[in-house]
């Protein structure tokens, strides 16, 4: 499950606006409609100008988010809670779809999902990927989160394909061991820029887990290390630089899967850590990422038996 920040819907529209001109027109049109509604009956001539969310404070964004959601149907609101795979939009096809089908468009119209995640099997070439993200956005009345897992190392859905010609980064473990802050900042910037060019607006990364269990094979080298402060510093740098490229960063896997022994991709797993232990270690990178204004947090299938 992914938790977005309070003004996520506005920021999502802004990210989409910067990556797709058609999204800009939708956002501006909606804002203008709201402004017309609020000023209707005033009897005074007024002028308007285009709004940019980066120029607005959090209170204003919260207000805009409330106004926009008031205009949405219950069905649309429920749909925004879901992120689906490409395959789930057209299950008649194989899981290796690399183009948008008519059924996918029909599904998005009937079930207005909040986002779509693409995997390596959906990503073939830069032109094909950009065409696919564009067409999925076109098929959705409400701008989509277009998401992908691009952590670096073994979880690199885009860079793992040589045809994509995307910058290849080593595992988080290697980054934590050998990269300085300048190189980490460049990594966040480069990943964000290259994903944006392909039509994505959300990266399901970085991994904020602190690896305190050396036998943890699920996280393993996907963690930046066992030092919670060092991991927190890396997360802060990555989030800030990635989001400067209009790519939403996603902190994962809350409340922290670095101490577990099971694989939450195959079910749930359990930890006996206390709340104080979590606060002392696991929570620190997430707190740092949230302070850096990360747009989203991914919640793990983790049971906390002592909390």
What does each of the following model-derived ranges do?
Residues 44-71, 78-79, 94, 102:
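N-terminal, intrinsically disordered, polar/charged segments of Gram-positive cell-envelope systems
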Residues 3-22:
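Short, Lys/Arg-enriched N-terminal segments with co-localized hydrophobic residues
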Residues 87-91, 97, 107-231, 253, ...:
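Enzymes and membrane/adaptor proteins characterized by extended Gly/Ser/Thr/Asp/Glu-rich
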């Amino acid at each position: 499950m992914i938790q977005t920040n309070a003004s996520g819907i506005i920021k999502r529209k802004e990210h989409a606006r910067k990556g797709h001109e058609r999204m800009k027109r939708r956002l501006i049109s909606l804002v203008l409609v709201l402004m017309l509604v609020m000023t209707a009956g005033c009897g005074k001539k007024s002028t308007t100008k285009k709004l940019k969310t980066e120029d607005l404070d959090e209170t204003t964004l919260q207000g805009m988010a409330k106004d926009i959601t008031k205009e949405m149907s219950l069905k649309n609101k429920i749909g925004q809670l879901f992120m689906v795979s490409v395959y789930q939009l057209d299950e008649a096809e194989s899981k290796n779809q690399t183009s948008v089908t008519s059924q996918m468009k029909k599904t998005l119209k009937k079930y207005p999902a909040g986002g779509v995640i693409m995997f390596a099997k959906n990503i073939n070439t830069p032109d094909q990927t950009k065409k696919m993200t564009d067409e999925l956005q076109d098929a959705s009345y409400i701008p989509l989160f277009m998401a992908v897992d691009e952590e670096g190392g073994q979880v690199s859905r885009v860079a793992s394909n040589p045809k994509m010609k995307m910058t290849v980064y080593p595992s988080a473990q290697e980054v934590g061991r050998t990269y300085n802050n300048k190189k980490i900042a460049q990594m966040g910037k480069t990943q964000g820029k290259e994903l944006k060019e392909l039509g994505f607006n959300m990266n399901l990364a970085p991994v904020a887990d602190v690896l305190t269990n050396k036998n943890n094979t699920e996280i393993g080298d996907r963690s930046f290390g066992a030092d919670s402060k060092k991991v927190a510093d890396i997360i802060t740098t990555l989030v800030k630089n990635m989001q400067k490229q209009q790519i939403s960063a996603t902190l994962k896997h809350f409340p922290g899967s670095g101490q577990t022994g099971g694989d939450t991709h195959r079910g749930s797993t359990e930890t006996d850590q206390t709340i104080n232990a979590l606060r002392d270690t696991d929570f620190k990178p997430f707190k740092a990422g949230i302070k850096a204004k990360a747009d989203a947090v991914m919640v793990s299938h983790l049971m906390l038996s002592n909390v």
